[in-house]
Structures are given as structure tokens and as C-alpha cells.
Amino acid sequence: MKKAIGAAVFYARFAIPFSRIGFRRRVGEAGLDADFSGQRWVVSGATGGIGRAIVLGAASRGATVRALGRDVRKLEALAKQATGAGRIQPVPVDLSLMREVARAASEIAAAGTVDVLVHNVGVMCHEFRQTPEGLELGFATNLLGHWVLDQGLRRGGALHGGSAIISMSSGGMYGAALDLEALQAPDAARHDGFTAYAQHKRAQVELTHYWNSLGPGQPRAWVMHPGWVDTDGVRSALPGFRKVFKPVLRTAQDGADTALWLAATRPDTGEGIWLDRHRDSEHAFGFTRAGAKATGLVPMLDVMATRATDGT
């Protein structure tokens, strides 16, 4: 009963702003007059939905985009769709495997600097699955892989003071106070895919605070969420939700808009999460303020990343 009441409150509060109606109210027909010529981008989760729209949007405005994804055929097809002066370079990588992510980061860094890094990949896993490295699949894909990619690019000198980091969170994080123990269940009996996903997305907010606390000469970071978008992930993970809200779900282009806008405008960093080119509070309910902070999250990610990449 408590869960049902919580869900009702959540949907009542966010149904309009997260829908296509909310996008039209805030962004409307405003275009994006941006020139990314000469910029090098890295986008994870590049072959579907929002990631694909970000890649195509950046390339059409002149960027060279390294598109990270697991499906080689989809990556190659995406590369052929580049328009304008930009290019799309496929980077085949399983973003749930930390050693593969570390390898990709090293290879990207060896090729030069990165102007925009978009942590877009995300998956909601209702069934408990572990990767060959012993990590829960959702945690590895949604959070630890972001950390490994970021750290690998930093160590390789690819990220610099002029770089932008944009993390694609989810409105689901509004219902979660960060709990480090809930980021990764140890077994199927204690796994809840919806709860874990919300935790991963809340953790992205804290990681953004951490990256912005590193001081001058470091990349600046923003965290955003796309609203409710009709993606393959929503179709497979939330079929009931999609059935109810399909008439007002956003397009992938709607979901990608704020990421492209942030990369173009580079607004001031600070607390908050971006939606539809506006900074909103990162807390809609008081209880989420009591969650864990980056001071606990970062050391945990660092240890787990080292174990996974070293094979220990």
C-alpha cells in the first residue's frame, strides 16, 4: 500500500512536466543554433533512442563523435547516417564490462582530447544478472562504467579544463535517497530493478557534484534528465507505464535536446538537475536530502573499478 501511494504521488506530481506537454511548454519550437565544428565528442549508449539522437545532433552540427555501443552493426549503420560536416566513429565496447570500458577510454585518449563526454548509457534490469566480472549488470552499466570511462579519459589527458561532461540521469531519481548498499544487490532475492535504477540515477547527481568540486583546470559537469521518452528501453522495461502514457511520451529528439543545449551554452554549474533547458531542484521530496553523498560514493566506486579492471 505504501508503495502504491508513493507511486501515485510521484506520477501526479510529474506527469505533466515530464511529458511531451512539459517539453512544449518550456522549449516549444525553439531551435538550437549551435556549431560544434572541430569538437571531439564521446557518447555512450549511442545506438538507440536518446543516445542516437545526441550523436546525430552533434555530428550534424560539425562534431566528430565517437559512438560507444555493443552492437557493431548498429554502430556502422549509425555512422552512415552522419549529415553535415561532422563524422561518427564507431567504438564497439560492452559498457557493462569494466576492462572493455577501460580499454576503450585508453584508446580514445591516445587519439586526442575530448571536448564533450556524454554518459548516456543506461539499462533497467528487472532480472538479477551478473557480468563476468562479478558485478550486477545494471550497476556496472549505469554507474561504475561511467566512473571507469571518466577516470580513464582523465588519466589519458583527454579531458581538460574546457571539456564538458553531461550525465543522463532519470526523473526516477526523485524518488530515491542515495543508499550505497542499494546500488548493487548481492543476489536475486534482494534485487529490485526499479529501485536499483533510481539509485544509480541519484548517484549520477552526486558524481556530478564531485566532478565540479575538483577545482580550476578540470572539466565542468552537468546532470540532466530527458523526461519521459518513448525508447526501446521503456518499451521493454516498463510496458505498463508505456501503455498508459504513450500518447504523451516524448520523442528521442526531445530527450536529447537539453544535452545538446548544455554542450552549446555551458551554463553555470551548481546544484540542480537540468530538464528542458532549465535547472530544477534535484530534490522534490524532503527525504532524499538525507541520502549518502559523493564523499562515500567515490571511494567505493574507485575500489570496485580497480578490482574489476585489475581482475582481482
Locations of the language-model features?
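Conserved glycine-rich Rossmann-like NAD(P)H-binding loop of the short-chain dehydrogenase/reductase
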Residues: R61-A77
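C-terminal helical subdomain
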Residues: P17, V101, K243-F285, A292-T295, ...
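Non-catalytic terminal and boundary segments that flank Rossmann-like NAD(P)-dependent oxidoreductase
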Residues: M1-R40, A292-T312
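Catalytic loop of short-chain dehydrogenase/reductase
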Residues: G122-Q130, E136, G162-Q218, H225-R242
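Rossmann-fold cofactor-recognition segment
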Residues: A82-R99
